[in-house]
Amino acid sequence: MTHNPHALVEAALHDLKQGKPVLVADSRHRENEADFILSAQTTTVEWVAWAIRHSSGYLCAPMPGPRADNLALPLMVPNSQDPRRTAYTVSVDAANGVTTGISAADRHRTLQVLAQAGATADDVIRPGHVLPLRAVAGGVLHRPGHTEAAVDLCRLAGLEPRFARLAAFPGA
């Protein structure tokens, strides 16, 4: 069976706009894994709970570098030894509207806050239960990672702010 790559991308963009997850796999020569990607702008508590339940549960929030700067999110480790150069920032929770921060509802709330165009550093607390990731400028053309794929897909879907969330899919 032959797949039309353009049709697959269009289907993924449609699903992101509808708040549904898409599965993005990388090369077997890289991490050899797949991540669920949801748009923080369109997803629901139910989909966040689903992603937690059917993934590693480790939720990341990819965003463009300028967005991380606006939220005053420094890198977790300034001189990372990660060979893949994943740019983790400090973890966060929403400053308001959450309890412990760990529930799907609380993490969904944190994602909503991170996705709000007018959100500032005062809208999140550190540390927390969501791990923002800083995407490389230029997207997958400059770094073929899930972080950049998530941000690029949200951009192509016309979702603002260009922001997503990832959950590693075990066994991929």
PLM feature spans:
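Catalytic domains of riboflavin
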Residues: 1-172
